[in-house]
Amino acid sequence: MSQKQEEENPAEETGEEKQDTQEKEGILPERAEEAKLKAKYPSLGQKPGGSDFLMKRLQKGQKYFDSGDYNMAKAKMKNKQLPSAGPDKNLVTGDHIPTPQDLPQRKSSLVTSKLAGGQVE
């Protein structure tokens, strides 16, 4: 059994060595391509944040996606200002439940209704 294990181990090592050499060969062409691209386009990949124009636009502050977002933000600002001019909080309501005796008498109407005339035709 030990002979079989020894035979399998060298085969595995050679397979691993082949993979290592393939990876190294695969990396070298990639490095060469990267070097060519960097030589052709030197300004790419230098700034992680992007172009100066993009950075300037991002630093200006909050921007809105469309007019709907702008209008919603504008409405929120108005809603924050409205409660400051709210009603007097000392006013108490609902202490007394009115009864028919407490209500003032209705004023009679100057024009009589044909329905309330009482005449039957």
UniProtKB/Swiss-Prot annotation:
Sequence positions bearing Phosphothreonine: T21
Tissues expressing this chain: Widely expressed with high levels in skeletal muscle and brain and lower levels in the pancreas.
UniProt KW keywords: Acetylation, Cell cycle, Cell division, Cytoplasm, Mitosis, Phosphoprotein, Protein phosphatase inhibitor
Free-text description of this protein's post-translational modifications in UniProt: Phosphorylation at Ser-67 by GWL during mitosis is essential for interaction with PPP2R2D (PR55-delta) and subsequent inactivation of PP2A. Phosphorylated by PKA.
A GO biological-process term: mitotic cell cycle
Residue stretches in coiled coil: none
Basic and acidic residues bias spans: 16-37
Taxonomic path: Eukaryota, Metazoa, Chordata, Craniata, Vertebrata
The UniProt record lists the keyword Cell division: yes
InterPro entries, A to Z: Endosulphine (IPR006760)
Principal localisation: cytoplasm
Intracellular or extracellular location(s): Cytoplasm
Residues recorded with modification Phosphoserine: S2, S43, S67, S109
Function comment: Protein phosphatase inhibitor that specifically inhibits protein phosphatase 2A (PP2A) during mitosis. When phosphorylated at Ser-67 during mitosis, specifically interacts with PPP2R2D (PR55-delta) and inhibits its activity, leading to inactivation of PP2A, an essential condition to keep cyclin-B1-CDK1 activity high during M phase. Also acts as a stimulator of insulin secretion by interacting with sulfonylurea receptor (ABCC8), thereby preventing sulfonylurea from binding to its receptor and reducing K(ATP) channel currents.
One Pfam family this sequence matches: Endosulfine
Span list, region Disordered: 1-53, 79-121
Name of this protein: Alpha-endosulfine
Domain of life: Eukaryota
Result after altering S109E: Mimicks a phosphorylated state and impairs interaction with SNCA
Cellular component GO terms held in the UniProt record: cytoplasm; nucleoplasm
Subunit-structure text: Interacts (when phosphorylated at Ser-67) with PPP2R2D. Interacts with ABCC8. Interacts with SNCA; interaction is disrupted when phosphorylated at Ser-109.
GO MF terms held by the record: ion channel inhibitor activity; phosphatase inhibitor activity; potassium channel inhibitor activity; protein phosphatase 2A binding; protein phosphatase inhibitor activity; protein phosphatase regulator activity; signaling receptor binding
Family per record: Belongs to the endosulfine family.
Residues found modified as N-acetylserine: S2
